Amino acid sequence: DPTVINGGVINSIKNNAQLGKGEWAVIESDESDGSFLKLPITYSIVTNLDKEHLDFYGSFDSLKKSFFKFIEKTPSFGKALICADDNNLKSIIKNLKTKNFLTYGFAKNTNYQILNVRKKLNYSAFDLKLRLIRSQIYTIKNIKVNLIGEHNITNATGCIAIALNLGIEINKIKKALNKFTGIQRRFTKIFSLGKKDF
């Protein structure tokens, strides 16, 4: 039962925040003002790095350095999950000194590689190939999320990776994903007209 602070309204709780009774806090943060560097982290998901907020950072190089610092501060008992599909993040991965990170995405040779995506009208299904240790390569079949769009599959994969690192069983993870109905105003279906969804 974690405390949750999110940037958008979570459909299941009709709010963007919830005070939990557990030890964990799940926070959606961004790099807009540099305050994400002050967050105490154990696990993080780094989804993408774009040329944004340059009014604050002054240059893209300065922005990249802030992401580098954020990932480097991952403690030895935690992990940063980095999306290897993002070209700007790839350049950071190459220069990391820390070993406390794992990669995920559609890209080949990631630690958590998305495979066999099946896109349906109201949900997406996919398989996940895990490469954690050379002798430990296996595939989790038929993961379903009640969301559409490759970005939602990628985001779900980052969450799955953290849950697995925390020792949560895959069946429990799949059950939780089946219950998740998304965030308001993020690829939200508003209405249907004929065979088209808007």
Model regions and ranges:
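Switch II (G3) loop of P-loop NTPases
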Residues: 23-33, 197-198
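Switch II of P-loop NTPase G domains
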Residues: 32-42
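Short beta-strand-centered segment that lines the nucleotide-binding/catalytic pocket of NTP-utilizing
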Residues: 1-12
